Amino acid sequence: MKSKCVIIAGEFSADVIGVEIMSAINNIEWYGIGGPLMDAKKLNKFYDWDKISAFGLSDVIFSLPRLYYYASKIADKIIKINPKIIVTVDTKGFNFYLIKLIRQKLKTN
């Protein structure tokens, strides 16, 4: 049985790094968010990465409701999968919030 792992990459440079990580580790069932390179490696996608992408201060501010919504949905999916590890690549602000949210949800369950 393959181990389940989650990887979150929200932009092209993260997709490049993410596919290298996925290629280096065998016998893993990968879940998460990535781009076309990670898709080609059979990533079980939660959502398209445009759901968690925002560039520039004004885009981030206007995207906050969407980012919070998807962070909550992604956290629920990760908790349900119960992965061995969670790998986050780039999109630091979103990923830090996501990990914090997962911890909070696990404490309340």
Model features per residue range: what roles?
Residues 4-109:
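Active-site and donor-binding regions of nucleotide-sugar-utilizing enzymes
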